[in-house]
């Protein structure tokens, strides 16, 4: 056990420091913004330091573990720990949240509350990724929903209340299934009930019970991921939310669902996962085609990017369903890769909206000359989203492809069919992404916007865009940096639960 509580500090620090902002005298919006950014940078530095000096990449077991008795009456523990599966998502959370706080500089209305909610969301997400106790995981999962709902309902477009209500109905409704699953999995067995994930991973269940528990967890994680047909909250939410909130949603929140599928469904319920994986493969394949074919019909810029997120999540689901070393590694790389790509695209869409106050693609056009820096960055990131070689998306999707080919679970004809359908989806992806760029930046100039010659990207926006782009190129050139973090954990999961 690690005796210095690194993870407790990392989880508690953002929400604690953010709470001070609410109680200290109001010093103006600028002070609140820089205070929040300093907290995020300090948190990211602490996280990086703790992981660099304490995390051993060749060890698949839980590291930096903390285990404290919390509530004696309920036998409830504060258990935290990280492994190769969670370290990448925690670092991604820190990086994207820091960029999102910097992107939120234009927010002036109730900025104290806005930045506090971002920090509270930060703590909830880190807590979810580092929890080693099932009930603590559920609490952090729910803690993260409250700030998201308030961010959606208070800052955004005209229909923000509708989208926020739809979001909370979907996510809170699915959380009931998560809670039932948590209680069911912890209370089963002749021994005393346990919520410790490491003990639960070594426990076996009757097939019927395992299937019931698996379905409950799957519904909860399918809403967050999202999987079709439980995805309809996503386009509405992204279409109305402030773009800094969209960065957090696309970059981190969607990845929590995929993380839960691996951490709980795959690790704790291996037999049920083996039974359900063909269905997940079908859903993931349909999702790629469905989102890629539906996206061109979206006239709202942010909704079109949201559908591209749904399509990319299909590759993650297919990688998880392949039950192979390359497939699962590719899914984890895609989680990190799309976290950066999705957040960056929403940021650039938001900066464009700040200038022209339009989100309808039909009303845009001819902006390439007036805002060449934004045009260049948007084009490069669109290329990254459509998996251009040299970018992280290409490597992730290629590894997932390889995982399907090497899978021993599926017949050859089934694998060929899945690969062909995925290839069709990859052909459709450039169509809607490039048409989106064409509608925004080419063609005739806008006729409805006064004083068309608005300013281009400033230093803050350029820094944000480049900061998002560098990891995408870095992972595209040297993906082993991310893959090496999780490879031992992936081998451990597959050998212990499927091939052992």
Curated annotation (Swiss-Prot):
Range of residues in the leader sequence: none
Keyword Transcription regulation appears in the UniProt entry: no
GO cellular component, one term: chloroplast thylakoid membrane
Encoding gene, per UniProt annotation: ndhD
Topology of the protein relative to the lipid bilayer: Multi-pass membrane protein
PANTHER family xrefs: NAD(P)H-QUINONE OXIDOREDUCTASE CHAIN 4, CHLOROPLASTIC, NADH-UBIQUINONE OXIDOREDUCTASE CHAIN 4
Subcellular location: Plastid, Chloroplast thylakoid membrane
Protein name per the record: NAD(P)H-quinone oxidoreductase chain 4, chloroplastic
Transmembrane segments: 4-24, 35-55, 87-107, 113-130, 134-154, 167-187, 211-231, 242-262, 272-292, 305-325, 330-350, 386-406, 416-436, 462-482
Species this protein is from: Aethionema cordifolium
Keyword NADP: yes
A GO molecular-function annotation: ubiquinone binding
EC number: 7.1.1.-
Catalytic reaction(s) noted: a plastoquinone + NADH + (n+1) H(+)(in) = a plastoquinol + NAD(+) + n H(+)(out); a plastoquinone + NADPH + (n+1) H(+)(in) = a plastoquinol + NADP(+) + n H(+)(out)
Lineage: Eukaryota, Viridiplantae, Streptophyta, Embryophyta, Tracheophyta
GO biological process: ATP synthesis coupled electron transport; electron transport coupled proton transport
Record's keyword terms, sorted: Chloroplast, Membrane, NAD, NADP, Plastid, Plastoquinone, Quinone, Thylakoid, Translocase, Transmembrane, Transmembrane helix
């Amino acid at each position: 056990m690690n005796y210095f509580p690194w993870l407790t500090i990392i989880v508690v620090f953002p929400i604690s420091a953010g709470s001070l902002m609410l109680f200290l005298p109001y010093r103006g919006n600028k002070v609140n913004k820089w205070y929040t950014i300093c907290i995020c940078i300090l948190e990211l530095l602490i996280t990086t330091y703790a992981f660099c000096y304490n995390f051993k990449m060749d060890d698949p077991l839980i590291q930096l573990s903390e285990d404290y008795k919390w509530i004696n009456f309920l036998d409830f523990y504060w258990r935290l720990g990280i492994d190769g599966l969670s370290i990448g998502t925690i670092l991604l959370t820190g990086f994207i949240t820091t960029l999102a706080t910097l992107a939120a500089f234009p927010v002036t209305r109730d900025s104290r509350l806005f930045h506090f909610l971002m920090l509270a969301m930060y703590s909830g997400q880190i807590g979810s990724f580092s929890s080693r106790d099932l009930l603590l995981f559920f609490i952090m999962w729910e803690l993260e929903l409250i700030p998201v709902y308030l961010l959606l309902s208070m800052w955004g477009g005209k229909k923000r209340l509708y989208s926020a209500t739809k979001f909370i109905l979907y996510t809170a409704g699915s959380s009931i299934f998560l809670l039932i699953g948590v209680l069911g999995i912890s209370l089963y067995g002749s021994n005393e009930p346990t919520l410790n994930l490491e003990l639960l991973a070594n426990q076996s269940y009757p097939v019927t019970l395992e299937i019931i528990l698996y379905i409950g967890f799957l519904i909860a994680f399918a809403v967050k991921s999202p999987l079709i047909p439980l995805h309809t909250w996503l386009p509405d939410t992204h279409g109305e939310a402030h773009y800094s909130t969209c960065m957090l949603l696309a970059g981190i929140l969607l990845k929590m669902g995929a993380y839960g599928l691996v951490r709980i469904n795959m690790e704790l319920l291996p037999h049920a996962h083996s039974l359900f994986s063909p269905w997940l493969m079908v859903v993931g394949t349909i999702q790629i085609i469905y989102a890629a074919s539906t996206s061109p019909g979206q006239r709202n810029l942010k909704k079109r990017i949201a559908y591209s997120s749904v399509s990319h999540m299909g590759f993650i689901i297919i990688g998880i369903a392949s039950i192979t070393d390359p497939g699962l590694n590719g899914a984890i790389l895609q989680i990190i890769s799309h976290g950066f790509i999705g957040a960056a695209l929403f940021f650039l869409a938001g900066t464009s909206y700040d200038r022209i106050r339009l989100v309808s693609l039909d009303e845009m056009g001819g902006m390439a000359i007036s805002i060449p820096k934004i045009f260049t960055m948007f084009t490069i990131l669109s290329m990254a989203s459509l998996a251009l070689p040299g970018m992280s998306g290409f490597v992730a999707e290629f590894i997932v492809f390889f995982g399907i080919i090497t899978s021993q679970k599926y017949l050859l004809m089934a694998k060929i069919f899945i690969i062909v359908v995925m290839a069709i989806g990859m052909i459709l992806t450039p169509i809607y992404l490039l048409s989106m760029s064409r509608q925004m930046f080419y063609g005739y100039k806008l006729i409805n916007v006064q004083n068309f010659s608005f300013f281009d990207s400033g230093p803050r926006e350029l820094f944000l865009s480049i900061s998002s782009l560098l990891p995408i190129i870095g992972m595209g050139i040297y993906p082993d940096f991310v893959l090496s973090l999780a490879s031992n954990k992936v081998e451990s999961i597959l050998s212990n639960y499927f091939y052992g």
